Each structure stands twice: as C-alpha cells, then as structure tokens.
C-alpha cells in the first residue's frame, strides 16, 4: 500500500504492554481528552465472572471509559484469534462510523498480530484427527506428543508448553491435516488491517520495576477476594484446567490450591512466577514489534503527553 492511500485510511490506536504496566489507567486518561472508544485486547477479560484475577476494570472505571469486548464469553467457552479479529473489526467499524477513533488496549499480542496482519489460512479442526491425537496422548502422555512436535516443528514446540494440550494438539492436527507445520502456515498472512494505526507500548524502564508491580498486584488481588472468585468457578463443576479460561495466569495456580495439590504459599509463589513469565513473553513480542513508540509507565503524565503529541494532531 502506498503512503497516499494509507493516509486516507481511518485512524486507530494500539496501546500495548505487559501485564501490570498501567495500560488500562492510561487508556482511561486518554479517553478523557481524545475522541476515542476503547476496545479490550485481552484473552482473559473476555470471560464473565473472572474479574479480580484478570484485573478487569472496575465499575467506576467502566463508567468513565466503557470497554468493548469485555464479558463476552462464559469461562466454559473457547475464543480464538479469528473470533477476536472478527469482533474487533466490527467494533472498529462501528466506532469509526460514529466519527470516533478506536483505541485498542491490552496485552494479548497474538490478538494484536491477528488484527494487524490478518490470519494465516489454517485448516479447520478435524474431529477424527483430534480424536486420534487425544488417544495417543492417553496412551503415551502429552510429554511424548510434545517430543513428536519438537521433531516436526521445533519453533512451535519451543513456544508451546507440554502441559498445554489444547495448543499442542492443534499444532499436531494442523500438520497431520495439511502436511505443513504451524510455523510455515502462520508465516503466510491474510488481509492486513485497513486502518492507519498508531502503535504505543507502555512498560517500566526496568524488569525489576515490572516484577515489583506484578507481585504487588497479585497480593492486591488476593486481598480483594481472588480466592473466593475462583472457588465460585470451581463450585460450578463444569470447568477444568484444560480450558483456556482456567489456564489463565493466577487462576491455574489458585485452582491447584483449591484442589489441594499445593499449599497457599506455593500458590502465591507460582502465581507471581507465572505472571512474570507472561510479562516476559509479552515483552519479547514487543521488542520485535515494528513501528511501536515506547512509553514509560513510571511517568504516566509524560506518557499521556507523548501520546497526545502524536494522536492529538490526527484527532483534530
């Protein structure tokens, strides 16, 4: 696309960053001074009844700055990057038609990538192939299947944990159906996003500061009733640890504690560690992200001013 046609496209803003970096607070401040509407880009915030452990904006924050694509799925339901792209594009079109600018805020980098670049042409799920993979897993264990994926697609294997049966079986399924690896196919993009996008990433200047923020927030969640929230989900009886919702950081560790697998102290330790690992993965994505402007989360006023300098001109 040439520069002239790109300038004529409608505007959009991405506000990305690792967990606990202050994205939501900045987005809410920006909505006060810019003609923007917020769209959540978070694979955990989509779930109803999962508010504390996901750091979902509270009622006052949502009144000041409504977020779209929150609470759109029950924790028992799946939600893919393709689902997100479809829903986000519909919301963006609605916002643009109303003469406002979509501000997409969150930390699910796969969703941002799917939206920006389009989706690769992956084969549809095949129940017969999936059943065969699950039978193999029952006989050999997921660790053995992960080793199989390591031989077929080492790049995907490095990204997928042996204890993540959903993603592991999908990577194998794609290969068995198409004869091509998940890595090969995901390098083929679909339709690019038809917007002129201004991209920002917010994070603390040092890893130590981010780790401190993560630990503090986890303890704040515990003090706010996180255990009771997960116990309510556990009591339903239809949820389990193979679901993406219950595999969310914090929830998986609290679930293990409720099941009696680990102590409370171990749950806290693992919850903080898994959140740090999530932040590390998010930062790895962002460091390789093209066209992003970095903002310092330790100086929110300056971050807001930097966004306004860039976006204020396009919002006029």
UniProtKB/Swiss-Prot annotation:
Pfam families listed in its UniProt record: IPPT
Q: Supply the EC number(s).
A: 2.5.1.75
Give a GO biological-process term. tRNA modification
Residues marked Interaction with substrate tRNA (site): 108, 130
Q: Does the keyword section mention Glycoprotein?
A: no
Role of this protein: Catalyzes the transfer of a dimethylallyl group onto the adenine at position 37 in tRNAs that read codons beginning with uridine, leading to the formation of N6-(dimethylallyl)adenosine (i(6)A).
Protein name according to UniProt:
tRNA dimethylallyltransferase
Source species of the chain: Salmonella typhi
Gene name linked to the record: miaA
